[in-house]
Amino acid sequence: MNVEVRLYAGLHTESVRSSGDVFTVPLAEGATISDLFSHLGIRPDLVHLAIVNGRILHDRAARLADGDRVALFPPVGGG
């Protein structure tokens, strides 16, 4: 299956598989959002907010589906 991934606020610099801010990722059927983090090489603690198809995802064990649109945001920082 394929999911569209958008990485915000510089999170793409943490990914070993990123080809920019928006890209498609092939995953095995039944993959979870945690599996996506592993595939991308992004530490889970670097992702504060995950949105799938416009809805905030609270359960990182939730399964993704083919065609899902995933947006990942790091914690907000600054002053």
Region locations from a protein language model:
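Ubiquitin-like/PB1-type beta-grasp interaction modules and other compact soluble beta-rich domains
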Residues: 1-78
